[in-house]
């Protein structure tokens, strides 16, 4: 278990990163990054720059635990070294970045490599608005994305505006029912269930 003070940052950087425990960064940021080179910049103890410079041949970020960043942000990133590499983001746990105060971030991003990467989602992603705040922002991106049955996504706000979930793959198939029939897609039932708790934007590049 890892917990920071308010505004703190946790950055786990390696070719393969796995989390099965809990990481709590109130008003702060958590990075789980598969890469060989990352540039960090700090000012007065706060992270001001986080740039993934170089990927790896076989990269993996695997979160089966709980990451909580109230008013903050959570980033799971896997960058490939080249087009013959592999970079995968797996999320089967809980990610929560609710907005509970004014000007809060409330952001969750799962980013596999956009050329050869894969992002697999079967867990919970919550970026809701509390105390009158708008819902947050969730993004799942990679060349291929699999949104599995049982995935829970919510950017709801009882007193504010519902937030947005962006699904951004190279290509994507919406299949009948809950099963995924291609290497990148979501079941229509799973998507329908998601639309009850978040706005969804599907964009392909």
Question: Language-model features: where?
Answer:
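Extracellular and secretory-pathway beta-repeat/beta-biased strand scaffolds
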Residues: 1-205
